[in-house]
A protein has these predicted regions:
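Short acidic/polar active-site loop segments enriched in Thr and Asp
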Residues: 19
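Single conserved hydrophobic/aromatic residue that forms the stacking wall/gate
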Residues: 1-12
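AMP-forming adenylation/ATP pyrophosphatase catalytic core
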Residues: 22-278
């Protein structure tokens, strides 16, 4: 969405005759030969290059990110020195376009409720949910089942959302095998400049502010897939997988499906649907 907004801002730039569009993103731009590269912001705790991975190199050539070389505290200090009224405003931590609204309440206004069962990996019913759209893979808080009689006290995590049965599958323990994936299939791949050749080494980030992991990107007959150097938790279809080499953001894609032999075998035994894109 942010990349599309930057593109829209470029249209405004063209219509007004401005030379550049400056935005408040914590990211940087550097020249590399004939290309303009998108770089991580120097303040790693605020870096927003993840959200800009769909911006084109052409648009980057006409963009300015003045905050990219600064820390948040430096920005606040500049604001205080210039008596700006928002100099001490609290950081926003939610989804910017819904304001102070509760996320679930906001979604329910558009999608309503679609109740279903919460089950464990063996199909035992543990409770009920009001809609799969209110949960994400790897989620621990807010599942709504609490302690389960006769079970260990370990935390429950969302491992699978089955659209056909409308079941939310949860497992116990952050180290449960069903939470981990060895890679993922990608859709709607976008390269900011030149694409990487197949089998290239890179780092991939699967959510905002998550630690990037070493990986290899591979081109298949149906698109791209990524193999991680080690299994990682909560790889979520629909989220963005953003590709880096060092500080440079090369582009990214939508996660189409996770790659996990444990998950595939379990899903097949349980009769749940999954896709393999090779």
């Amino acid at each position: 969405m942010i990349a599309r907004l930057v593109g829209s801002e470029m249209c405004i730039r063209d219509s007004t005759g401005a030379d550049y569009i400056a935005t408040g993103h914590y990211a940087r731009i550097e020249c590399a030969g004939d290309n303009i590269q998108l770089m991580r912001g120097l303040d790693k705790s605020k870096d927003q290059s993840y959200f800009l991975h769909q911006v084109s190199g052409i648009d980057l050539n006409r963009a300015l990110f003045p905050l990219g070389e600064l820390s948040k505290e430096q920005v606040r200090s500049i604001a205080r020195d210039n008596n700006l009224i928002n100099a001490n405003k609290k950081d926003s931590v939610g989804i910017c376009f819904i304001g102070k609204n509760n996320y679930n309440d906001f979604i329910s206004n558009f999608l309503g409720k679609n109740p279903g069962e919460i089950v464990d990996e063996n199909g035992t019913k543990l409770g009920s949910h009001e809609g799969l759209m209110y949960f994400t893979l790897g989620q621990r808080q807010g599942i709504g089942i609490g302690g389960v009689k006769g079970r260990e006290q370990a935390s429950w995590y969302v491992a699978h959302k089955d659209q056909n049965s409308n079941q939310l599958v949860v497992v116990q323990g952050a180290d449960n095998d069903l939470l981990f994936s060895e890679g993922c299939y990608l859709d709607e791949m976008h390269w900011i400049n030149e694409k990487l050749i197949s089998e290239s080494d890179c780092e991939v980030q699967i959510r905002y502010q998550s630690e990037p992991v070493s990986a290899k990107i591979i081109q298949t007959k149906q698109g791209y897939k990524i193999n991680f150097s080690e299994p990682i938790s909560a790889v979520t279809p629909g989220q963005s997988a953003v590709i880096y080499q060092g500080e440079v953001c090369l582009g990214g894609a939508v996660i189409k499906e996770r790659i996990s032999e444990n998950y595939f075998n379990w899903a097949e035994n349980r009769g749940y649907n999954y896709e393999v894109y090779e």
